[in-house]
Amino acid sequence: MAASHPYFNLPDFTQPSPPSTPSSLTSNHHNRCGPSNATKGLFVALLGGGLSAGFVGPFSRMAYQTSQLPSLELLIFRCLFHLPIALILKFRGDPLLGPPDVRVRAFLHAILNVLSIGCAYSAVQVVPAGNAVTVRKGSSTVCSALLALCLESQRLSGYAWCGLFGSTLGLIIIVGPGLGTLQEGTTGLYTALGYVLAFLGGLALSLGLQVYRSLHFPSCLPTVAFLFGLVGLIVSVPGLFVLQTPVLPQDTLSWSCMVAVGLLALVSFVCVSYAVTKAHPALVCAVLHSEVVVALMLQYYVLYETVAPSDIMGAGVVLGSIAIITAQNFSCDKEGQVEE
C-alpha cells in the first residue's frame, strides 16, 4: 500500500468513489502528475539546505581571517540562534527535551550534529573553504548510503546510484589535486588534519541524519533544533576557554559574518532535517553537494582564493548529478502505484 511506503505518505485513494462521480473526474483525481514527496524534500534540501549552507564556510573563513575568531566561539554564536525555538515548544505545551522514551536518541542527534559542525568550522580555518566543504559532503554521502543499506535495507534505483556515483566523482575531481600536493612539515600536517576533520564532520552528519529518521513524535523538528543549541553551548563554552582563546570582534565585518552564519546555518539545519524525512538520506546528502558549488564561487569572487580548472570541472559533474537525482524522483502519483 502507498501509505506504508518508507519515503512517501500518499493519500489513500483505495476507497470506492461515490456512484454519482463521473468516471472522467475519478480518473483525473486518481492520476495526479507532479513532484512526489521525495522530490519536494530534495528541492527543500537544494534550495534551503545546500544554497544557504554554501555561504557558511566562506563567511566562517572571513570571520577567522578578519578577527582570528576561534571555531568554538563561532559555534557558540550559532547555537544562540537555536535557543529561541524553546518559545515555540513552550507555546505548544511540548517538553523542551522531548518525550522521555526518545530523549536519549534526541540528545545523541544533537551531540552528533555539534561534533559535525565543530569539525567543519575547524577545517575551514586551515584548508580552503571549498575543499573542506567538499570532503565533508562527500564523506556524508558515502556514509549515508552505506548506513542506509546496512541499517534500513533501503534500495536505491539505478538512476539514484548513478547520481550518487557522479556527485562523489565530482567531489574527488575537486579535492584530488589538492590532496596530492600537501606540503611537508608543519603546514602540511595542519592541512592534512583539516581534511581529516572535514571527513569526520561528514561521518558525524550522516550518523545524525540516521538518528533523526528514527525519531517520531510531535514537534520533533523544533525539539532537535533546540537541543542542538543547548548541547552546543554546554560543550563549546568550556571547550573555548580550555582549548582556544576567546576573541571579541571589533569590526563590523566580523559581526556581520557571525550573524549571517547563525541565520543561514539555522535555515539549513531546519531544511535538511525536513528533507531527510521525505527522501533517502544519501540522496539528500548528494543534493547538498550544491553547497560545494556555492562555496567555490564565494571562494573565488569574495575570498579571492584560487579556483583550479579541476574545481570547475568537478562542480559541473556535481550539478549534473544533482539534476539526475532530482529528475528521476519526479513522477506521476497514480492510484495503487508507488515509486521504487
From Swiss-Prot:
UniProt region (Disordered), positions on chain: 11-31
PANTHER family reported in the protein's UniProt record: ACYL-MALONYL CONDENSING ENZYME-RELATED, SOLUTE CARRIER FAMILY 35 MEMBER G5-RELATED
SUPFAM superfamilies: Multidrug resistance efflux transporter EmrE
Topology of this chain in the membrane: Multi-pass membrane protein
Protein name: Solute carrier family 35 member G3
Chief localization: membrane
Residue stretches spanning the membrane: 39-59, 69-89, 107-127, 160-180, 189-209, 223-243, 257-277, 283-303, 307-327
InterPro entries the UniProt entry points to: EamA_dom (IPR000620)
Keywords: Membrane, Repeat, Transmembrane, Transmembrane helix
Subcellular locations according to the entry: Membrane
Family, similarity comment: Belongs to the SLC35G solute transporter family.
Keyword Metal-binding (UniProt): no
GO cellular component: membrane
Pfam families recorded: EamA
Organism: Rattus norvegicus (Rat)
UniProt KW Lipoprotein keyword: no
Top-level taxon of the source organism: Eukaryota
Residue ranges of every copy of the EamA domain listed in the record: 51-176, 223-327
